[in-house]
Design a protein with these regions (language model features):
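Short hydrophobic alpha-helical runs that function as membrane-insertion/retention elements
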Residues: 100-106, 123-126
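Short, Lys/Arg-enriched N-terminal segments with co-localized hydrophobic residues
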Residues: 1-15
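Short coil/turn connectors at secondary-structure junctions
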Residues: 64-67, 98-99, 120-123
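Short acidic, glycine/proline-enriched helix-loop-strand junctions
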Residues: 112-126
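Gly/Thr-rich phosphate-binding loop signature of adenosyl cofactor/nucleotide-binding cores
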Residues: 14-95
Length: 126
C-alpha cells in the first residue's frame, strides 16, 4: 500500500501464538456437544471468528476456515428453512474444511445430523 508521500509501507501482520482449544473451552465456559472428539491436540491459531452465513448458502470462495466458526441466530434460522438433503450437503461441505470448531450462540442447539457429521469429521461443536 502507498502512503501519501508515495513511499511503500510494510503491511503489519498480527502474529498470535496458538491457543489450546481446552483453554478456550474453560475460559469461555463452553459445553462440548461432541465429547467423542478429542480436544487434546487441537489449538486455534487465528484471533478472529467467522460467521459462515455465505458458506451455508454454498459460497465457499475466500472461506476463512482457519477461524472459529460461529453459528448465530441468522445462520440457525436459515438452516431451519433448508430441506434435509440440502442440509446434509451443506454440513458435508462445511466440515470438509479443517475448521477448528463450531460454536452455537444464544443457547441454540445444533441438529443431530450436524453433531453426527462433526463427530465423523472430528470437529468439536460447542
Amino acid at each position: 500500500m502507498l502512503e501519501k508521500s508515495g513511499e511503500c509501507r510494510k503491511e503489519r501482520k498480527i502474529i498470535m501464538a496458538k491457543v489450546e482449544m481446552q483453554k478456550i473451552v474453560e475460559k469461555m465456559n463452553l459445553k462440548n456437544l461432541t465429547p467423542d472428539v478429542s480436544l487434546e491436540d487441537r489449538a486455534v491459531g487465528v484471533p478472529d471468528t467467522n460467521r459462515p452465513a455465505l458458506q451455508l448458502t454454498g459460497f465457499f470462495e475466500h472461506f476463512d476456515y482457519k477461524r472459529v466458526q460461529i453459528i448465530g441466530y441468522v445462520e440457525y434460522t436459515f438452516l431451519k428453512t433448508v430441506d434435509e438433503k440440502e442440509k446434509e450437503r451443506i454440513y458435508d461441505t462445511l466440515l470438509s474444511y479443517q475448521i477448528p470448531c463450531i460454536v452455537f450462540c444464544r443457547d441454540l442447539q445444533p441438529e443431530p445430523m450436524l453433531l453426527e457429521k462433526a463427530n465423523e469429521r472430528q470437529v468439536p461443536v460447542f
